[in-house]
Amino acid sequence: QRQLAGFLRRHGVDLIVGSHPHVVQPYEQDSNGIVLYSLGNFVSNQRKRYCDGGIVATVEVTRSPDGSLRYSLELTPVWVLTPGYRITPSEVGDTLSMPADSRQRYERFMTDTRLLLGL
């Protein structure tokens, strides 16, 4: 992944978004662009640790008067609550309505994901 991302960046690609590993992976951001190695799972029945959630990436690209591009990135962890496959963002607030085992998995995913991404 890193070799491919490096190759693409050297050849002018500014924004790279990966998804296949089914788990959230680190990202890189600098003045030349953003590499999101994996967004994890958005809607999935995979319930293994780290496979039961993902991140929503909001990227804003603006062009400066000199023609250069600027990138801003906002990452929002989300967790898939089953049954029903409800996407549950990190700001859900009320986890008390979740079954205890779901609440524990939700909190573990959010804690681990925030640590991984430095949020």
Where are these regions (language model features)?
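Conserved beta-sheet core of the metallophosphoesterase superfamily
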Residues: Q1-I55
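A short C-terminal boundary segment appended to hydrolase-like catalytic domains
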Residues: D52-L119
